Amino acid sequence: MANVRKRRKKKNEHKALRLTFITLLMVFLFSCVAAAGVGLAMIKAAPPLDVDKVLNPSEPSVIYDDKNKLVDTVISDTYRTIVSYEDVPDNLKNAFISIEDERFFNHRGIDYKRVFGAFFRNISNKLKGKSALQGASTITQQLVRNTLLSQEVRIKRKVQEMYLSIQLEKKVSKEQILEAYMNTIPLGGSAYGIEAASKQYFGKSVKDLNLIESAFIAGLPQSPSTFYNAAMSQKNTERYINRTKLVLGKMREHNYISKEDFDKSMAYIDKNKIPLKTSNINISRLNYEWFSREIIKQVKKDLMNEYKISPTEADKTIMYGGLKIYGTMDKSLQDFSQNTLDNLDGILGINSKDYSGIIQPEASVSIVDYKTGNVKVLIGGRGKQPPLSFNRATEFYRAPGSTIKPLTVYGPAIDTKTSTAASSYNDAPVPEEIGKLYDKEPYNPKNSPNIYEGKMTLREALMKSKNVISVRIEHELGLKTGAEYGKKFGLTIDDSMDGTSMAALSLGQLSAKTGVSGTNTLGMAAAYGVFGNKGALSKPVVYKKVVDRTGKVLLENKYASSKVMSPEAAYILYDLLKGPVSYTPGATGMKANFGPMARGKTGTSNQSSDLWFAGLSPYYSAAVWIGKDDYSPFTNEFGRYIGSSDAALIWKLIMGEAHKNLEYKTIEKPAGVTEAYVCSKSGKIPSSSCPRDSIKLEYFIEGTIPGEICDYHTGIFNNNKDKDDDDDDKDKDKEDEEENKDEKNEDKKEAKDNTKNKDKDKKKDNDRKIDMDKKPDSSKRKRKMIKPQI
């Protein structure tokens, strides 16, 4: 019996093993079938094998303007020069094969031995806690990837790469594959292909490379950006030195070089390192350097973010991808603006070439359609400057001077209801008790010109750019609040330096030289658009979409904005900004007045290093900057500092051109904005003694109309007869409180009571009707005010 039980047990064990084996086999076979199915699906989704694109992949990307007309071609032969297989030194061919694909002439597109070796090494690395993965791509696979596929690190792309490599090997020779590979491979910086790399690193043609130089270039594909940066900066040079030695070792291992040549090369490197003669490739100038370069920069950045690819891969996509990039530039307006900046002899008194042949003073202009964020004009300098020149419209920080006031002082004060457009301030030197809060020595800025006029409203202070009143308002508002608004407007403000500086936040004297604070014309143009866009800051965009050569949309810029202030505050600021460009005595920007749609503000930094004008219309916002690249003072022929009126004049010329075929229109007034008459001296309800020319109609955010009567003059002015009964009750309470005061106050009470008898005193009222100097168009407005009753 015992033997029978043992036999049964053994039989059951065999049965279980067979069942387990069959199950595992079924799972394996099912997995293989599933994997094969997935693989076939991936292969079917692969792009067609276009041999011509593989062997001749240089299809240029192009840039269009806002009317879809071609304005620039991105790629040029100076990025890459084709070299035939016969003209490439054997050492360079052998170096690439040794380090990149040692069995290149033996496989048919895929090196299976290398694939399995890399697979097991990667598993081993994973078990050991190492993150580095080893690739197994052949030269054929790399060529297919660089010319037909994306750079995504995904299984699907890898399967397609292997499939297309096998197909390619069936149709072309090894020599053709190697030639195409060497002419397309990214090798750091702007060099694509071996000829461009030879000139970039050694200043010679590829046919003249020696053994060490060939080994250096063949080692670059592993990490072109890293080796390029090390070569150009001469820092961490051991990176490319060790890589070059590794290539030489591989060449010796595969008998491409003799032991003698290997030993001599290693000894030379140990003694002399690798003598480089680096230089930037002579890139051809684009038709629209300032605008098109910015488009290329933004497209590169967005490709990297959207598809998680490296800078080198993004460059390759732009230069060889045959992309169609639809820009936002208004070509005719860009041309007009550039021509205006290039011909300032009648405006600017200085036109020297002091800095490396660059004309001085320099200038920049940006124009934005703030409703969409589309940039229409972007000019970073005067004259035809070399390719990749410094773009002053986007790449620098300068102190904005008084153009900052609407952003960090007046706008925030009205938005937070700290002030109104009618708030009255004393145009007089800043009191010591305020000044000492902001400097070791009491901060005591001066007006420019150094004139003080006493009481005036916020509106008049902005029109005349009164520095001392800006400081007084910022003191009430608080530096922290001013800095927060500045950042929301897009200014770069360093908290440790300018975030606590009264001079920086109230007068725009930001620490631009440090490179950590300031703005540029694109930033300032976008910021001023807030006042016409219901308080929203539109993200500036220089292109609308990018389409690849198959018609697929790779990138699309959708409208994006952020709220900066209320629509009511933005509208009031928009109206306030008509003051500086008016022809009123004391207005600082009247030279910018191209017509009734003009709004804006001047700005001048310390010692006239920066001259600004920024403003807007119902159509566009724009900014103009003039200055010197070395931040030196801007003076006239008599050594006197020059003001910002020249920037205002340039702004007028360019914005006038932008609006020459546009109909007059206005900005819609929000429902939350109301109107009332005020005294322009006190900012309060006019009294019967307020001079006729001091009574002005003003805008207010609902609920902020002043309740006090002018104490600068005497008498009472009924500003709100048509308000509800609650307001009348408040007025009656005020009368009761003053009942026992002197005769003058009694007269005020009587005058106020008389306003309730409009029909009885109608003739008298008409006789004494106030003639407003700047009465706005009332045909479409409902005003919450009445005419004065005395």
UniProtKB/Swiss-Prot annotation:
Compartments where found? Cell membrane
Q: Which GO biological-process labels does this protein carry? A: cell wall organization; peptidoglycan biosynthetic process; proteolysis; regulation of cell shape; response to antibiotic
- From the UniProt entry, list the residue stretches annotated as the region Transglycosylase: 61-230
Q: What InterPro entries does the entry give?
A: Beta-lactam/transpept-like, Glyco_trans_51, Glycosyltr_51/Transpeptidase, Lysozyme-like_dom_sf, PBP_transglycosylase, PCN-bd_Tpept
Q: Which residues form the active site?
A: E100 (proton donor), S402 (acyl-ester intermediate)
Q: Has keyword Chaperone?
A: no
Main localization category: membrane
Question: Which pathway does it serve?
Answer: Cell wall biogenesis; peptidoglycan biosynthesis
Question: Locations of Acidic residues compositional bias?
Answer: 724-740
What are the GO cellular component annotations? plasma membrane
Q: State the membrane topology.
A: Single-pass type II membrane protein
Q: Which UniProt keywords apply?
A: Antibiotic resistance, Carboxypeptidase, Cell membrane, Cell shape, Cell wall biogenesis/degradation, Glycosyltransferase, Hydrolase, Membrane, Multifunctional enzyme, Peptidoglycan synthesis, Protease, Signal-anchor, Transferase, Transmembrane, Transmembrane helix
Annotated segments matching region Disordered: 720-790
- Family stated for the protein in its record: In the N-terminal section; belongs to the glycosyltransferase 51 family. In the C-terminal section; belongs to the transpeptidase family.
Annotated function: Cell wall formation. Synthesis of cross-linked peptidoglycan from the lipid intermediates. The enzyme has a penicillin-insensitive transglycosylase N-terminal domain (formation of linear glycan strands) and a penicillin-sensitive transpeptidase C-terminal domain (cross-linking of the peptide subunits).
Stated name of the protein: Penicillin-binding protein 1A
| Species, as recorded | Clostridium tetani (strain Massachusetts / E88)
Its gene? pbpA
